[in-house]
């Protein structure tokens, strides 16, 4: 309690100083982050007084979700209920000429805000920002802010609970305290009516708050180029709520594209009697794009192959309550891989994501969270239309956005009676499409996997899951050829499969002879379908082969728009309790902490310009096989030439060739020796630069027998924690590389496991990968030995004591 009081006093002092500084300025516009020093109450009462009188509040900082761990623990379900947040705001001085508000970047799913005991406002929908005006409710001195957030199942609000992701409850994004002069700029809407390499124009619509109808207002807009040099400015008198300024004939604009995302800055100043009262800043990019009929995509008049991935908004240990640094790290990793496109699935994401995409040069598919559940009643439709309007209005100015998606798999598994009625769905989809084009005629609309509505939107993605949910991945070219002809503007969103880090096999299951090779459509119900998702081994090297084939096809097809891999990062889902890591969709090419899997380097080899080599695989360092039976080894690289060395001896130099599969021809037959094998791949670029990768493989000639026990070991990590590893061994003390059963870790004394993280080293229950599983353990800090156990149905308990010093 003492710590909480200290935090409150510090928060009051900061806010007091902040407002004194800001209010002493003529230009009294402020925006202050107030994420720190909140209190949280896990109580679903709807009564404010009950919350005010509760004693079991806990101290937290924002962003926050109450589902950070229960989403991925071993118990079925997760908390879908209400919670309360509380913050004390001390404002030393109230200026009667100022308007005060709270801005929430996202609060999931429904929110009510109370200030000093009175309701200030509410919001429906968890993935878009909203502002609550608190001007008439605040007072000089201490102000009590209470916020009730509710993520209970509500059939009237999208997304449907049948969606394949968690709907995290809480204030999951930043919160800001805003103060503006009574006459201020509410919004800037910026368009580029004309763009070419030679000239461009800019149109700025400013929405002005002028409650007292002041007659002496003026608006000044300054445009600066990416280097910060002023290229245009204009001042006009403001006589209405909407003011418009145009800049024509801007010579030789520096275009925004995926390689050089040039951003101009637009700064607007609202003045009253020649005193600046408010300002607003936006970034703008000059670019134009086109989807050719039955053909490729063009950006700024040049063909651009869309090289995309998907992003869910979550992180191990945080759920959706990610910091801006974590958001930015995801996007930088996507860009470093060489991607130029990201589909934000299946909902709008944190403002930091759009900012990063603008700055990094990533095209964006922004999506309304109409994901499954079918069409609803009148209230459902009103909520959905309002949400689309909010999304477009809030994200309009981002040059990275090229598509407003109106939904995904919308008619799957209806929540309402007759919710999969095609006629009703198409009427409503048409209404959404009209809203999107009215609000923004410059961008395209899209949907995925609702075939009956494909003619309504501008761009359509069918379902193609070659090699996973249906058929062989080698049917991919046939699939895209069919859809290029069928759909005027076709893009392929979603392909891939699950992979369990560390699982490898010398002969991955491909489904040959077991499945219908020509299929590619994902069935709604999988119980009667034979596919690799069900019969495959979920090995990293199968997924490497699958992605390698898809990229081999897409990179060599001159008429293809491009594709969008599903998904960049492993993410949690309530629909997959039986997966190798329970409740995790493991289709990511990085794990839930952002650590790359093998597949990440396949994409990087096709897409990235940063020279590298990667030997497949750094998570496959224990192998077995007959003596004098060479194994084919792949190196993924974007270098022009690569040489592979084994035990210091060159196995030859090979030229990378995009027309060859696998690995663009960078494969060698390696005759492994018994014991340690050192492999080095040296890549050489066109300009003579060299890069290398080294891999050590322990190889044995005798195959393991059936597992007879589990063996525990540990190592101390740099962060002071311990990594406890279990391996399955046979009677000859050989690791059983074919053992894939689940094991359960438990810390009995001296610490706690990093459980419920949904990662390869952060799940108390996990299937073994090549006879191995690990978990990170945190010591309790009192220097007592840590006692660990691991068990499953076959092995009733192995124990390990870790001395702590």
Language-model regions, residue ranges each:
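Accessory carbohydrate-binding/adhesion or oligomerization-edge regions at the termini
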Residues: 24, 28-73, 144-148, 154, ...
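Beta-strand-rich binding/interaction modules
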Residues: 115, 199-236, 243, 631-653, ...
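Beta-strand-rich structural segments
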Residues: 204-208, 266-269, 633-637, 713-714, ...
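Edge beta-strands of extracellular beta-sandwich domains
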Residues: 234, 279-284, 688-701, 796-805
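Extended substrate-binding grooves/exosites of carbohydrate-active enzymes
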Residues: 62-69, 152-155, 164, 182, ...
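Accessory beta-strand-rich segments of carbohydrate-active enzymes
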Residues: 32-34, 39-43, 75, 80-187, ...
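Extended acidic/polar, glycine-enriched regions
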Residues: 139-142, 205, 209-292
């Amino acid at each position: 309690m003492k710590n909480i009081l200290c935090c409150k006093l510090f928060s009051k002092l900061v806010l007091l100083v902040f407002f004194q500084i800001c209010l002493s300025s003529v230009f009294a516009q402020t925006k202050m982050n107030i994420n720190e020093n909140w209190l949280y109450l896990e109580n679903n009462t709807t009564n404010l007084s009950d919350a005010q009188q509760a004693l079991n509040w806990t101290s937290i900082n924002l962003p926050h979700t109450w589902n950070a761990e229960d989403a991925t623990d071993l118990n079925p379900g997760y908390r879908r209920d209400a919670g309360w947040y509380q913050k004390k705001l001390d404002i030393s001085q109230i200026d009667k000429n100022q308007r005060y508000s709270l801005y929430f970047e996202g609060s999931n799913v429904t929110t009510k805000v109370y200030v000093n005991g009175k309701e200030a406002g509410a919001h429906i929908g968890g993935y878009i920002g909203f502002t609550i005006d608190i001007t008439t409710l605040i007072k000089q001195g201490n102000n009590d802010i209470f916020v009730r957030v509710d993520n209970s199942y509500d059939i009237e609000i999208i997304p449907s609970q049948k969606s394949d992701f968690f709907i995290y409850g809480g204030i999951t994004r930043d919160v800001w305290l805003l103060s503006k002069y009574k006459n201020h700029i509410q919004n800037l809407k910026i368009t580029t009516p004309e763009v070419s390499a030679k000239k461009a124009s800019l149109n700025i619509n400013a929405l002005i708050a002028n409650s007292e109808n002041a007659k002496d207002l003026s608006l000044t807009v300054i445009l600066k180029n990416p280097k910060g040099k002023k290229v245009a400015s204009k001042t006009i008198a403001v006589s209405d709520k909407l003011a418009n300024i145009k800049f024509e004939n801007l010579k030789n604009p520096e275009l925004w594209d995926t390689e050089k995302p040039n951003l101009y800055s637009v700064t607007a100043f609202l003045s009253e009697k020649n005193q600046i009262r408010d300002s607003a800043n936006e970034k703008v990019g000059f670019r134009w794009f086109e989807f050719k009929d039955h053909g490729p995509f063009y950006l700024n008049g040049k063909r651009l192959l869309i090289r995309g991935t998907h992003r869910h908004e979550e992180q191990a240990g945080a759920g959706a309550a990610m910091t801006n640094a974590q958001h930015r790290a995801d996007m930088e990793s996507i860009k470093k891989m060489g991607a130029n496109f990201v589909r934000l699935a299946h909902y709008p994401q944190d403002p930091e994501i759009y900012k990063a995409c603008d700055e990094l040069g990533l095209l964006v598919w922004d999506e309304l969270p109409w994901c499954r559940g079918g069409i609803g009643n009148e209230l459902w439709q009103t909520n959905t239309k309002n949400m689309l309007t909010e999304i477009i209005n809030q994200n309009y100015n981002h040059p990275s956005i090229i598509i407003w998606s109106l939904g995904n798999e919308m008619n799957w598994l209806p929540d309402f009676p007759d919710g999969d009625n095609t006629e009703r769905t198409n009427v409503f989809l048409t209404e959404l499409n009209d809203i999107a084009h009215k609000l923004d005629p410059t961008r395209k609309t899209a949907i995925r996997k609702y075939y009956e509505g494909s003619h309504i939107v501008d761009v359509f993605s069918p379902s193609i899951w070659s090699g996973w949910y249906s058929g062989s991945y080698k049917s991919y070219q046939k699939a895209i050829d069919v859809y290029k002809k069928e759909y005027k503007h076709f893009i392929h969103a979603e392909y891939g499969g699950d992979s369990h880090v560390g699982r490898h096999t010398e002969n991955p299951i491909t489904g040959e002879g077991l499945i219908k090779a020509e299929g590619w459509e994902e069935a709604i119900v999988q119980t009667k379908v034979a596919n690799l998702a069900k019969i495959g081994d979920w090995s990293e090297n199968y997924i490497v082969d699958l992605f390698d084939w898809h990229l081999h096809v897409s990179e060599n097809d001159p008429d293809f728009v491009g594709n969008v891999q599903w998904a960049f990062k492993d993410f949690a889902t309530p629909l997959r309790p039986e997966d190798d890591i329970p409740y995790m969709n493991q289709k990511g090419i990085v794990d839930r902490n952002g650590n790359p899997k093998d597949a990440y380097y396949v994409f990087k080899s096709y897409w990235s310009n940063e020279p590298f080599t990667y030997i497949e695989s750094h998570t496959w360092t224990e192998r077995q096989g007959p003596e004098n039976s060479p194994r084919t080894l792949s190196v993924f690289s974007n270098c022009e030439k690569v040489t592979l060395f084994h035990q210091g001896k060159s196995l030859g130099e090979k030229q990378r060739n995009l027309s060859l599969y696998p690995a663009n021809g960078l494969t060698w037959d390696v005759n492994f020796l018994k014991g340690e094998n050192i492999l080095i791949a040296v890549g050489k670029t066109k300009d003579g630069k060299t890069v290398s990768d080294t891999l050590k493989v322990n190889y044995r000639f005798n195959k393991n027998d059936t597992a007879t026990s589990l063996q525990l070991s540990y190592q101390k990590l740099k962060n002071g924690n311990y990594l406890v590893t279990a391996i399955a061994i046979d009677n000859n003390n050989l690791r059983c590389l074919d053992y894939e059963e689940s094991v359960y870790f438990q810390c009995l004394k001296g610490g706690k496991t990093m459980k419920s993280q949904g990662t390869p080293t952060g799940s108390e229950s996990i299937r073994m990968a090549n006879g191995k599983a690990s978990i990170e353990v945190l010591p309790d800090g009192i220097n007592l030995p840590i006692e660990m156990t691991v068990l499953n149905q076959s092995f009733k308990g192995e124990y390990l004591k870790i001395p702590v010093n």
